[in-house]
Structure formats: C-alpha cells, structure tokens
C-alpha cells in the first residue's frame, strides 16, 4: 500500500534488486517473459504503475491530469521506499518507465548499480512537431475521445504500436 492505494507488483528471485518499469499504457505483464530470465540474477521487482495493470486507479473526479509525471513518480518512489528498495538497484525501463527510472536514479544516485532502457524518453517533446511524423496520428488518437476504446478495448497499443515499433527481426 502507498497511502490508501494498492500498488500491484511481481517479486521473484533473491539478491540485488532488479527493478522493471513498464511504459504507458502497459503493465508488469510486459515483462512476463523477461522475469524468469532475470530472477536468477537478483530480486526482480515489476510494479504496475499507479492507475495501470492491477494497481489501484485514481478517482476520475481528480480530472484528466490525475496521472501527471509528478503524481506517478511520487507513488513509485513511495512504493520503492515501502518495500525497501534502497541500494545496488538495477533499473530496466521501457517508455514512460524510463523517465520515472531516470528521475529516481537522479534522486538516489548512490542506490544505482546499473540502468538499461528501451524506447526511452530521453528528451522533452514540447509539441507534436517534435514527434516522429508517422507516430503523430495514432498518439493523437490515443488522446482523443476514442482513446480509451483504442487502448482498453482494442488493445491497439500492445497489439499494434509495440510490434510495429520493432526495426529489425528479434532473435
């Protein structure tokens, strides 16, 4: 529990913490095939960020900005503190999780052992003009009135965006 909210997470293995941070809008399910491979190397911790996966959701009444970076980061930092993640941390992060992980590392530099990331947010995107041209349409769609249906009902992010973002065949 973080405050009154439940943060769901998977924890497997023993040893130094390996923190898996998913992107938006996904969950710890993203790491389902990675966790078994890493659990022999340390204690793998894969939380569902607040509002995603099996973690509690914030009240709709709090408005459309209830999941700002600051809010999500605070829940993540408080969660890590609550479960005792403090030293020799390896962060493995994807997408939105990279921004959260990088910031946690900046705030806790003596706690970091290593960082690995993919599809990271490494610089600000101030406007749609800063986005890759072929991504603008779909991501604007996710932010439209149809966005919830596209993501939750049609699973377009997981089934469409992620697989189509791979630039080469995976081995």
Predicted feature residues:
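Flexible "cap/lid" subdomain of the alpha/beta-hydrolase fold that forms the substrate-access gate
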Residues: 4-10, 17, 30-31, 45, ...
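The serine-hydrolase catalytic nucleophile loop
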Residues: 24-35
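Short beta-strand element of the alpha/beta-hydrolase
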Residues: 16-22
């Amino acid at each position: 529990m973080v405050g009154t909210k439940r943060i769901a997470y998977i924890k497997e293995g023993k040893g130094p913490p390996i923190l898996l941070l998913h992107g938006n809008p996904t969950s710890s399910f993203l790491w389902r095939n990675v966790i078994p491979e890493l659990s022999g190397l340390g204690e793998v911790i894969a939380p569902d960020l607040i509002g995603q996966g099996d973690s509690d959701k914030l009240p709709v009444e709090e408005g459309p900005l209830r999941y700002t970076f600051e809010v999500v980061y605070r829940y993540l930092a408080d969660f890590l503190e609550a479960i005792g993640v403090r030293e020799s941390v390896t962060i493995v992060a994807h997408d939105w999780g990279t921004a959260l992980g990088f910031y946690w590392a900046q705030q806790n530099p003596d706690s970091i052992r290593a960082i690995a990331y993919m599809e990271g947010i490494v610089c600000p995107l101030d406007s749609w003009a800063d986005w890759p041209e072929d991504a603008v349409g779909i991501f604007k769609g996710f932010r439209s009135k149809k966005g919830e249906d596209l993501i939750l009902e049609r699973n377009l992010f997981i089934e469409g965006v992620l697989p189509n973002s791979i630039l080469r065949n995976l081995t």
